[in-house]
Amino acid sequence: MKTYLVTGCAGFIGSNFVHYMLEKYQDIRLVNLDKLTYAGNLENLEDIKDDARHIFVKGDICDKALVTDLIAKYDPDYVINFAAESHVDRSIRNPEIFVESNVLGTVNLLQCCKDAWYDADAKTWKEGKKYLQVSTDEVYGALGAEGYFMETTPLCPHSPYSASKASADMFVKAFHDTYGMPINITRCSNNYGPYQFPEKLIPLLINNAKHHKTLPVYGDGMQIRDWLYVMDHCKAIDMVANGGKDGEVYNVGGHNERPNIFIVKTVIEQLHDRLKDEGISEELIKHVADRLGHARRYGIDPTKIKNDLGWYPETPFEKGIVLTIGWYLAHEEWMDHVTSGNYQKYYEQMYKNK
């Protein structure tokens, strides 16, 4: 039986990964360490709360004693780090939090793994161990109208969020180069799908449109992103963990580049047609001041992971957005719970005066 220590898996991508792995593998153990910040939600794991293969631990990846104890107790074969503050707008307001979670938290995980797995006298690592860092294409910066990010593209982050993720990636690489730690890094494009906190574009649009609230669009809305259905991403992480070449970075993209305004209009059209609600229309769109340092285009070339591991994105955007909207409409109680209280205060801070 393989054991995974997965961090941040009460959040969006992490909780989907837990569901994916439990469905795919019977003989598995997932130890899930999550601090349960605003975007970490135990309701994301409600349907597996009685599954003995999943062990939830509330705690911080910065807590050295806790991480050390978990590694000693469960002896994980893999440590996969999903834990991160991930919203660019929040990083612009409070960059210190991003340094603490994304940089210092990653360094603590790396050091704890090294302490447990590395024999300094023999200069050898325990067999079958690996650390995998889940990162983002935003570490590469911005693209022009043509071309794609490749694994060899220099890191050039533009926001405090992407700077924190790039720094974490460099520490992961440094532990590999300095100590020989077995590692991989995955860098993904924009994920969408179930369980995503509604500060992110697609669930925010769905929630606002249902309630006939304004749909805020940064600038002209022509910023282009590559959209990756979250379960395709989970499959890629599984394949990299179990088959990725030691020390390698793998880009994970969806081949689904779309301008943000296209996403907005697609969600409006889908909800209008599904709900037969004339109040859901493009009249809800409101262009607001553009985000500071907002990159115009991201695009990923996933050729390497396809050639090395056989992975490819199985879900075209046209299918994925239908699945995603259907999930949120079927889980209104989940949305109501996560958008209460502190979310309302945050939303007002971000958009009230724009």
Label for each model-derived stretch:
Residues 66, 97, 104, 197-201, ...:
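Residue-level recognition of oxygen-bearing side chains
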Residues 41-44, 94, 145, 197-201, ...:
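Residues at alpha-helix caps and immediate loop-helix transition turns in enzyme cores, especially N-
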Residues 41, 145, 194-198, 256, ...:
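Residue-level signature of the cytosolic catalytic core of signaling kinases
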Residues 1-191, 241, 295, 323-331, ...:
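N-terminal Rossmann-like NAD(P)+-binding domain of SDR-like oxidoreductases, especially those catalyzing
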Residues 121-123, 141-145, 180, 196, ...:
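Proline-centered turn/helix-capping motifs that create local helix->coil transitions or kinks
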Residues 146, 157-164, 194, 198, ...:
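The catalytic Tyr-centered alpha-helix of NAD(P)H-dependent dehydrogenases
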Residues 4, 17, 24, 30, ...:
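C-terminal substrate-binding subdomain of Rossmann-fold SDR/epimerase-dehydratase oxidoreductases
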